[in-house]
Amino acid sequence: LSIRRQRQMCIRDRLLLQALKLEPKNAKNALLFSNLGLVQRRLGEFDKALESYSFALNFAPLAVPILLDRAAIYMEMGKTDRAYTDYCQVLDEDKQNKEALLMRAYIYVLRRDYPAARIDYNRLLELDPQSYSGRLGLATLEQKEGKFREALEILNKMLAATPEDATLYIARADVEREMKHEDLALVDLEEAIRLDAASADAYLLRGNIYLAQKKKGLAKADFEKAISLGVPPADLHEQLRQCK
């Protein structure tokens, strides 16, 4: 952000805090704290934003939008257990909240609680059968449970509808890799890179396939490309060592 923009936001912060001090019991303070949290989040001040959202929830403990905002910050900070609690509270208030269903399902997958994840994905897809994130999440779940054909069926249908989506080609390539269909995976990754040459995930996955095939030169080139696109070098230290 520009210095001018930062100053404007600091002034806004001070005005909000002044309003809170003038009327500490005003129910509208929930909105003020929520707005302050939004500003702080945009500045990357996640700890301050969490504090603001928590203050807002003191005034309006069942406010779904504020719970969702706080949960999103918890997710960005890697605090998935706290995010989970907020998403559960959202769903207690609104059983059809699609964002909460999607994110809670994702957390269940991280926890390897696949039956619970499937329940939430199925609920989401009942509400919104064309949900991109819901279908992609379910495909990932099928893959993690070793149900590769089911995962491919979902991804093939999605690609039929959106054939220019690089993310879907990468997802399908990863399933094909696990099925030992490396040649098919490489074709999909080539298409993904054609559609999005800045996709670090595509180079990373292709590099791993090349490494498994003992094509060390090709693997090294892809890993180095992934690093140039933002993958931390430390994450690929072992792979690059194996390329020597």
Could you tell me what each predicted segment is?
Residues 26-29, 63, 97, 131, ...:
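Residue-level recognition of tetratricopeptide repeat
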Residues 18-24, 54-58, 88-92, 122-126, ...:
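Conserved structural position within tetratricopeptide repeats
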Residues 1-7, 11:
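Single conserved hydrophobic/aromatic residue that forms the stacking wall/gate
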Residues 5, 42, 76-77, 110-111, ...:
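Register position in tetratricopeptide repeats
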Residues 29-32, 66, 100, 134, ...:
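TPR alpha-solenoid repeat register
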